[in-house]
């Protein structure tokens, strides 16, 4: 893996239950099915690639106070995506609980990660919500990876 040590330093304190896929230029372009055989951080860093993605839903789990959770993400993409979120969900995303957030550095783009209680993982559906063309947000849970 290119930049293996830099990636490890950035992710070494992530929860034990997170699972990863290898990527090339922000795409999972490899023959293995990362959803059937997800990798630990250590495993994925030994492979070819130039980045890693974290798998969502039941692929990346943790237990908090005896309760099991899977990882979910809300992806905000484009100017006014916060208004699109508010239109479809019913409240301003600024009211969301503070959480780990990542960005590519591009204006108005970010992903916010949340632990979803196990009983809701099958109830919540992946969805993409667009409003007036470009501004959208996406709820990512099941067979999906995030960069």
Region annotations inferred by a language model:
Residues 1-147:
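Conserved phosphate/metal-binding and DNA-contacting active-site motifs used
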């Amino acid at each position: 893996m290119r930049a293996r040590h830099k990636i490890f330093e950035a992710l070494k304190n992530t929860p034990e239950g997170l699972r990863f896929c290898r990527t090339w230029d922000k795409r999972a372009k490899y023959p293995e099915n990362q959803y059937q055989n997800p990798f630990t951080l250590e495993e994925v860093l030994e492979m070819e690639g130039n980045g890693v993605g974290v798998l969502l839903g039941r692929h990346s789990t943790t237990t908090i106070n005896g309760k099991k959770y899977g990882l979910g993400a809300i992806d905000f993409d484009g100017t006014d995506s916060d208004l699109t979120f508010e239109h479809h969900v019913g409240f301003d995303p600024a009211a969301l609980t503070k959480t780990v957030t990542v960005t590519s550095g591009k204006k108005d783009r970010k992903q916010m990660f949340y632990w979803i209680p196990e009983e809701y993982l099958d109830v919540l559906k992946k969805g993409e919500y667009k409003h007036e063309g470009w501004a959208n947000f996406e709820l990512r849970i099941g067979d999906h990876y995030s960069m």
